[in-house]
Amino acid sequence: MVKISVIMPVYNGEKYLEKTCLNLSKQTLTDIELICVNDGSTDNSLNILEKLADKYDFIKIINQENQGSGVARNNGIENAIGEYIAFLDADDIYVDVDALEKMYEYGSKHDADMVGANQKRVSIDGNLEDNFNYKQKNYTYFSDYGVISPQEYGIPWAFYKNIFKRSFLNKHNITFPNLKRGQDPVFLAEVLTKVNQIYVVCTDLYGYNYALGGGANSKVNDYNKKLDYMNHYKMTFKILDDAHFTEISNSYKKQLITYLKLKNNRNDKELFEIVHKIFEDDNKTYFENVDEEIIYLELCLVNPENKDVYTFLIESVKSQLYSMNINNIQINPVIFKKYLEVLSATNYSPSTNPEMCQLRDEIENSNSWKCTLPIRLTKNMTIKVLKKIKNKVL
């Protein structure tokens, strides 16, 4: 019986395959299979895999046209026969030699749908380093055997440091979306919102080769990748919000804002046009000023159910608006109108803040605000008329 099927998408990984397969062969759990999904590699990866399959009897090779790692992982899951599913990228490693065995035994004992472990970073010279995500509390470090709720996991990152019961994934039809970038958090968000509890083990399963994988910026480097990466945020937010995973969702929204404020991203007009297209359905005007785009996005992402993140976003917007005002930078009335709408919807009175009250008065007395008054009045009147018609029909 195959206890764990390890899924490994392979695209032009000829430099790493021998080392990665050797690393996996050292795991103390021997009842495993490694499903290598060759994703249309154009280098010597397939030939190397075939030689490795002769050497290691646990290797199975699947070939597909180049469709991306998400589709490759789905293909691997469909062809897996193991009780549990694990994931491994061609340039990464498993750290503790008994990690899979510990996780399988604990998961099997408790009939767990998901078993979590810990992760290390692999430096450019191959040394293991601590994972900074634990210090930043992006997700939880497991210091002992135990059980946690899915809400305690943290933001849906590092899916590969966990194993998942295959029958659970099939039952809930959980797969990777067909995105060029960002498919991993969508997959893990689906898991977290479907699983009842997570069994955790104090072991280092995964070694992520950060030097080779790079950060998001190095991977999101053309229009389609940027589009998919921003879409993954929207998809993940919806999954989490629909399941009332408010705290995790809002924490991930903060990650998006932080990402967009990075120096390299602030100067990427193409990226912000994509952000505007995906997130700002109620605003047809693209703001040429990056700060205005970020402010409007923050207002679109506000969710009052989580007080901490709501306060974070509102205070961020408020301080940016006030800073623009005292520096004599004209504030777009569309942004301030959205700000007042958010405050009104959350029963927060802007009049309790003298500075913002003054700013509101200045904007409402400005020429740009007065010039757009007929448009706003017409829009409001149209909405009222439509509501009356709807009520009569009902």
Language model features by range: what are they?
Residues 2-5, 33, 186:
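Cell-envelope/extracellular polymer assembly enzymes that use nucleotide-activated donors
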Residues 38-47:
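A conserved acidic beta->alpha catalytic loop
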Residues 315-394:
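Boundary detector for helix-to-coil junctions that initiate low-complexity/charged tails
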Residues 69, 90-201, 206-224, 265-266, ...:
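Donor-binding/catalytic cores of nucleotide-activated saccharide
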Residues 12-26:
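Short, well-formed alpha-helical segments that are part of the catalytic scaffolds
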Residues 85:
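Short aromatic/hydrophobic "clamp" motif used to bind/position activated sugar donors
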Residues 64-80, 90:
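Glycine-rich, basic loop-to-helix element that forms the pyrophosphate-binding segment
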